Amino acid sequence: MINIQMIGIDHSRASVEERELFSFTKTKQKELMEAVVRQQSVDGCVLLSTCNRMELYVSLDAKAEPDLYRIICHCKQISGEEEKRLRELFTVRTEEDAVRHLFLL
């Protein structure tokens, strides 16, 4: 069974300045997606990035639970207290909820 997960930050929970911390150039988008698919049990991923949101959708093996937030922070060189503080701004969706959200955008 496929497991779909989404992690994202958007205008409803984060300021422009906070969202800018997680904006990605084309090169950084590629680096992030390559880092994600290198994780064991990850089949693929898609990154959606606009001025209002950044959302990472990942297809995983059924029981896999990689820490996608840590992978994102590593690619953006965010760590320590800042990493802990910003985690609460992110939304995580799984399975049908993640797919439904994607199609409502």
Provide a role label for each language-model segment.
Residues M1-L105:
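N-terminal ligand-binding/catalytic initiation module
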